[in-house]
Amino acid sequence: MTILQRVKAAGGLPIRAALLAAMLGLLGAHEAAAQKWPDKGVRIVTPFAPGGGTDVFARILAQRFSEVFGQQFIVDNRPGAGSTTGTEFVARSPADGHTLLMTSASFTFNPGLYPKLRYDSLKDFAPVSQVVKVPHVVLVLPSLPVKNLQDLVRIAKAKPGEVFYASSGPGSALHLAGALFAIQTNTQLTHVPYKGGPAAATAVMSGEATVSFSTIETVLSLIQAKRLRPLAVSTRERTPALPDVPTVMEAGYKDYEVIGWFGLFAPSGTPPAVVDALSTEISRMMTTPAIRDRAAQEGATPVGNKPAEFERFLRSEIAKWTPIIQKTGIKVD
């Protein structure tokens, strides 16, 4: 007879006491681990190549965390397979707070894009905080006779399939932003994938593509230099970085909203005290003038929300995008 069987045979109270003791012991182990954290260097994995918005904000966090927590935080770029390579690496990493994930809206797209995804976006991660949000910008070449969104839609309807939109790759945020725009405006746009957001913007400037739905941090300097013309932004409110540019909703498409964002995650099972420490520091960072100014340079709006709020946002975004992806028929597997 096992110990558990003997306890059970003796009556119900001892087994409840034993289970309670086990739970308390587990909580104690988590608290002890959290008190020692970090006891070595911490890796912030970003599943994209260096230079993009995710990488930029991961490095901002790494520098601040190194100063605050007394250990070296480094950024580890692990691009590939539509961001799933680096994301899966973190999902399979020890849940001790020494491997973190900094990623983007692709995190909420991938459950719909990859039927054979080898991790669960909700079950395998502990959301820490949405760091910033960034709008997408509908962009064209300034020399085109397109002054506003209505002009673009008019041309697209007059020439079905002849308006080419550049994206940063199949299944990317830029791809989905364009696909949703085509649905909402009842137009037929032709998708042209490129290797990254900067390449998509270059395609518009060279005339290879008509339009792009780029994230603002990639193209803000090009807009300011008047090398690209912004027609609209994808969020509900105008962005402070481009206050004179209307939203897509203002142009009459009330259901169009695409929220770009960058956020921090830990593997599921990471001690709550570690998650809370990271989240609290991000919230504090997002209120400092230096960080707010740095975010503004990238066209981003600081968020710094708590884990529970971030999780609610993630669930709502997955619920929104999965049926949209199914409707468009986009597949990347």
Please give the residue ranges for each predicted region.
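Sec/Tat signal peptide C-region and signal peptidase I cleavage site
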Residues: 28-34
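Beta->alpha turn/N-cap motifs
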Residues: 102-107, 167, 197, 214-219, ...
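An extracytoplasmic/periplasmic, membrane-proximal ligand-sensing/linker region
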Residues: 39-41, 183-187, 250, 272-333
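A ligand-binding cleft/hinge motif common to bilobed small-molecule-binding domains
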Residues: 107-116, 175, 180-184, 211-245, ...
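N-terminal (or domain-start) structured segment
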Residues: 34-123, 162-164, 186-213, 222, ...
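Hinge/capping helix and adjacent helix->loop/strand transition within the periplasmic-binding protein
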Residues: 92-98, 112-199, 248-250, 261-294
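N-terminal secretory signal peptides that target proteins for export/translocation
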Residues: 1-12
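Bacterial N-terminal signal peptides
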Residues: 12-28
